[in-house]
Amino acid sequence: MKKINYEFRERLNKELGGFSYNYCYQCGACVGDCPAHRFLPEFNPRNIILKALYGFEEELIGEGSMIWNCTNCYNCYERCPQDVNPIEVIVALKNMARRDETAPSGVDYVIDKVKSKGVTVAETELIKRRRKELNLPEFKMDCMEDLNKIFSINKDN
């Protein structure tokens, strides 16, 4: 039988700036409209909140954690009758995993792409050609100055 990891819960509370997830009464409203759950039934925001309540650190931010399957759609935020905001808990867990260096390597790759190019996926010749065929304007990246300001404020990321 696993024991509640109070130390991990305290870390999560600090990351969240509170403990709103303690108000979850496991109604499942967050799961009902979750696109990630629809395509991957193992992903379950309700279970993530339950594991957070128990402080199951390894299952939440260890290798193979399900939190990375969240699409950040905010449907759970809209549906929760208790204002638990499961997405905020999931984002906090992702931040903790990055700091603990347990995030999948692809996460750092995407962050590096955003820092260097301002996008998560580089524009390929195929994309350029398709945009032209669809009469879409050339893709211009003119936000790097703003992005660099944002990244300079938060040096942890």
Tell where the protein language model's regions lie, with residue ranges.
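Ferredoxin-type iron-sulfur electron-transfer modules in oxidoreductases and energy-metabolism complexes
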Residues: 2-16, 39-67, 86-119
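N-terminal capping/interface segment
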Residues: 6-22, 148-156
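Sparse, context-dependent recognition of short Cys/His-centered cofactor- or disulfide-binding micro-motifs
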Residues: 9-10, 14-19, 33, 55, ...
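Cysteine-centered iron-sulfur cluster-binding motifs in ferredoxin-type domains/subunits
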Residues: 20-37, 64-84
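Well-ordered, non-transmembrane segments within structured domains
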Residues: 34-35, 48, 157
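Short flanking/linker segments adjacent to small metal-binding domains or redox-active Cys/His motifs
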Residues: 77-90, 94, 113-157
